[in-house]
Swiss-Prot record:
Homodimer; disulfide-linked. Interacts with IL5RA. Interacts with CSF2RB. GO terms for biological process: immune response; interleukin-5-mediated signaling pathway; positive regulation of DNA-templated transcription; positive regulation of immunoglobulin production; positive regulation of podosome assembly. Keywords: Cytokine, Disulfide bond, Glycoprotein, Growth factor, Secreted, Signal. Glycans are attached at N76, N90. GO terms for cellular component: extracellular space. Belongs to the IL-5 family. It comes from the Eukaryota. It comes from Canis lupus familiaris. This is Interleukin-5. Homodimeric cytokine expressed predominantly by T-lymphocytes and NK cells that plays an important role in the survival, differentiation, and chemotaxis of eosinophils. Also acts on activated and resting B-cells to induce immunoglobulin production, growth, and differentiation. Mechanistically, exerts its biological effects through a receptor composed of IL5RA subunit and the cytokine receptor common subunit beta/CSF2RB. Residues 1-21 form the signal peptide. It is found in: Secreted. The keyword Heme does not apply. GO terms for molecular function: cytokine activity; growth factor activity; interleukin-5 receptor binding.
Amino acid sequence: MRMLLNLSLLALGAAYVSAFAVENPMNRLVAETLTLLSTHRTWLIGDGNLMIPTPENKNHQLCIKEVFQGIDTLKNQTAHGEAVDKLFQNLSLIKEHIERQKKRCAGERWRVTKFLDYLQVFLGVINTEWTPES
């Protein structure tokens, strides 16, 4: 019995380790970018006089274009160094990933039931994952 428990714990540990080994590369890229952003925030702020249009809408999923326009403005107006270049390189890779995902939005025509199923899931995401406006 004890041997079975030890084997079960060993298998659980192996599954846990392998789950981390297969972590999504985009998640790692975003985590690294957040760290770089946090580390170089003061450098990016500079003298604080740069004005960048910032969406008022809290649902950032709706403002992707505006967010990346702001990133381009920041990139063009910021003195570059090796670390800041890495930040902008990561942001560019994230933008490319999002653009590839957006191409998946186009779909073929299906019967209305399939669309209604999709619409139901879409509304569920809005209901649970989007920040409500006050």
